[in-house]
Amino acid sequence: SISLVGDSPDTERNTAKKRLISGEIRFIFVVDIYNEGVDIPAVNTVLFLRPTESLTIFLQQLGRGLRLADNKECLTVLDFIGQANKKYNFEEKFAALLSNTNHSVQYELKNGFVSVPKGCYIQLEKKAAQHILDNIKSSFSNKSGLISRISTFEEDSDLPLNLSNFAGYYHLDIRTIYSKFSFSRLSVLAGVKADFDEEVEDVLTRAFARIVAIDSRRWISFLLDILPRLDNVDFSALGAVEQRMLQMFYITVWQKAAEDWNSDEVLENLYSLADSPVMLSELIELLQYNYSRIDFIDEPVELGFDCPLDLHCTYTRDQLLVALDYMTPSNIREGVKWLPEKQLDVLLVTLNKSDKDYSPTTMYKDYSINESLFHWQSQSTTSDISPTGQRYIHHRQRGSQVLLFVREFKTDIAGTAPYTFLGTADYLRHTGSRPMNIIWRLNRPIPAKFIKKTNKLIVG
């Protein structure tokens, strides 16, 4: 073996790669080099011998061994975990390897990392696993860990404390904050923000877990425009699509629809938000953060009326149903809803169903076949000759539309998981009856970022 550092002689650095590939040496130990720009596909073992603070560098170092090569069956990664600084973030390193799960890193660690990519395996010694669990518990996964990080953030980062800087510096999934807390209250408890007493704090803190998933540019832009001037808006004079977007926001925060924009209760709730400058400011900052993170193209879907739902955006059940003028979404217990006034069939699909959440008669087999075709199983009581089955089959001739909303799991780390709107779909064919197995043809293809999740049940 040899060791290389930044000031090693050029001749030694230039010959090291050939000597490793030829087998003349078995290991190259490096410090602060080989992070990027070095390609040695034959590398089949990577050792991490000290903590790496930068997530980017960690992934670059791991990537040195991820190339395919002849006679290379796998990559073995040995990460020797020492007594690292208590602020060292193990959680983000494992989260980067677990991008296809809605479970927490703690859950994955305790259950053997069941969600790592196919062909991968993570094994930890018992003491190392406990050390990482302790690190995570003292880091971002609990109140005291968040408060500790917030209290020293500006000193640690040389950045002003705000939500965007905090999440970016620590590579943080902000759902870990908003599953239970508000950033403003945590900042007060950390001693870096003046205390406040606002009427809307409790209800908005609970709503943040739902607001954190909003990713429609059109909806966010509307909210950013109207929220700062709530006490100077005639809500009943808003246009149809704007009223629907405000309705979606109202049910997100107060968990019920606004039946009348001029009712005392509705106005009192909206004005209480206008009278809560600290929480309103955080709400606006969260929406701005969400907007900055959108990485796909969203667009309106033509449904025959001014509908605020946009293609490939994320919505809770309540949000999407009030957007379609169905004002009592809590009454729905199944994953289907026929809206005769709008001539719409709404299909709410959960791909990965657990036995404890679904009965044997509701464990439907739902998955995408490719980017344009989706296999969907109807309710177990729906036959192909029933009025519902006939409506599915002949919806185009009858002038109705089918809307497909899909989520991977029932819950995520923020609570109840929202749905992704895959747009309208047309009946192609079916087999069976009670239940019907229908193949829908989507009118817009599923983007690559979603297809890996929607077809996972048939490719693995």
Model-inferred region functions:
Residues 94-233:
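Long, largely alpha-helical accessory region at the distal end of helicase-like NTP-driven motors
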Residues 411-460:
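Compact mixed alphabeta submodule
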Residues 41-45, 53, 70-76, 399-402:
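Short glycine-/polar-rich loops that comprise or flank the Walker A/P-loop
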Residues 240-346, 351-354:
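Charge-dense, extended regions
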Residues 1-35:
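Conserved helicase ATPase core of P-loop NTP-dependent helicases/translocases
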Residues 189-191, 198-207, 213, 217, ...:
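Acidic, glycine-rich low-complexity segments with interspersed aromatic residues
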Residues 51-98:
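Conserved segment of the helicase C-terminal RecA-like domain
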Residues 28-46, 63-67:
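SF2 helicase motor core recognition
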